[in-house]
A protein has these predicted regions:
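Non-catalytic DNA-recognition/assembly elements of restriction-modification systems
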Residues: 1-24, 184, 190, 195
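Short amphipathic alpha-helical linker/capping segments at the junctions of internal repeats
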Residues: 96-100, 171-172, 181-197
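A short beta-sheet element
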Residues: 43-44, 58-123
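A short glycine-rich beta-alpha junction/loop motif
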Residues: 98-105, 137-155
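Short, structured motif recognition centered on aromatic/hydrophobic residues
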Residues: 9-14, 39, 72-79, 147, ...
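Sequence-specific dsDNA recognition surfaces
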Residues: 15-30, 45-74
Length: 204
């Protein structure tokens, strides 16, 4: 990003700037783990929503207690570790406290980073994240250790806030025309990606 001094930029790993939490799935053959559940439970297929205000499924307290599902706080970022097609490597911002399945990892930001900045940075890293995934092709997968070691560039908090403010505006513009003509949507998406890359291109 133009105007940011190299001396103000920190290069960290995701494990240094966030707590990484994995999820789990209660036994689906036990109805008491699912029927009339009240605990939001997110699957990797929902990461396409980008912002998570609700989940498609809920689990009961018994299901939660008898699985490796873990509650994570709002204003965190989830990333798909695995999933069909293009799902692996996608990220979403969670706006409520929820639990997830084992195909998602939640990154809970520490004081050094704003969650929305972390989200946009990882969104820009989609192809690279898929490249470093274990395995090959569509059968590959991310894991906690890969994420902990994954590099991220951290500018000062005021710069993070500026980046988020600008990209939020572009994000709204893209979403506002989602019902428009395909060519217009494609053009706006390319503009968004171009400016996102420019904003997140800090001095090396």
């Amino acid at each position: 990003m133009v105007g940011v001094s190299i001396f103000n930029i920190k290069k960290k790993n995701l494990g240094e700037v966030s707590d990484i939490v994995l999820g789990g799935t209660p036994n689906k053959t036990k109805h008491e783990y699912w029927e009339n559940g009240t605990i939001p439970w997110m699957s990797s297929g929902e990461v396409n929503k980008k912002k998570i205000y609700s989940t498609d499924n809920f689990i009961t307290q018994a299901g939660y207690d008898n699985s490796s599902a873990t509650m994570v706080p709002a204003n965190s970022t989830v990333i798909a570790l695995a999933g069909q097609g293009k799902t692996r490597g996608l990220v979403a911002r969670i706006k409520i406290s929820l639990s997830t399945n084992q195909s998602l990892a939640t990154l809970i930001p520490k004081d050094i980073i704003i969650n929305d900045y972390m989200y946009y940075y990882l969104e820009s890293q989609y192809n690279k994240l898929r490249e470093v995934s274990s395995g090959d092709g569509s059968r590959g997968g991310l894991n906690k250790e890969i994420l902990k070691r994954y590099p991220i560039v951290i500018p000062p908090i005021p710069i993070q806030e500026q980046v988020v403010s600008i990209l939020d505006k572009f994000d709204r513009l893209v979403n506002d025309i989602n019902e428009g003509l395909p060519k217009e949507i494609e053009l706006r998406q390319k503009q968004y990606e171009y400016y996102r890359e420019r904003l997140l291109n800090f001095p090396k």
